[in-house]
Amino acid sequence: MKPPKLSVIICVFNEEPNIRPLNKWINESITDIEYEIIYVDDGSTDRTRQEIIALNDPKVVLVEFRKNYGQSSALYAGIEQASGEYIVTMDGDLQNDPSDVPMMLKMAEDEGWDLVAGIRKNRQDGVFLRKLPSKIANSIIRNSTGVHIKDYGCTLKVFKSDLA
């Protein structure tokens, strides 16, 4: 069987109410591309795992951690499981728009880019607790690395799997 074009990796922790709407949103947004959805359950204590299993979606792969190891470990596990030519990373909290993925993939392919990174526009966190420190951190990272990504903290990214 031919591997999919995209592996969509979603690290989740206690995202039970978001699983069904997110999966539906992805399936409605990515229509002309072969893809798999890899949910990495990072030790959820709610019914996130059961919601993923109940999807009964042949595109879905579930990777389970027995306890919470954090997003970096979950992302690594998802990448290890991925079989797509490109990897998409996104959050499970419905703040990333899956309808951006086909456009981001097209940009990567047409422009020959290794990475296309999303930007959080309608963030649901507070200005002083999250947004301002994020702007400062993004500026420091840009200036110290010379890599100009507008929002390093945005999980929505598309990149070639051979770079992972």
Model-inferred region functions:
Residues 1-28:
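N-proximal low-complexity "stem/linker" segments adjacent to membrane-targeting elements
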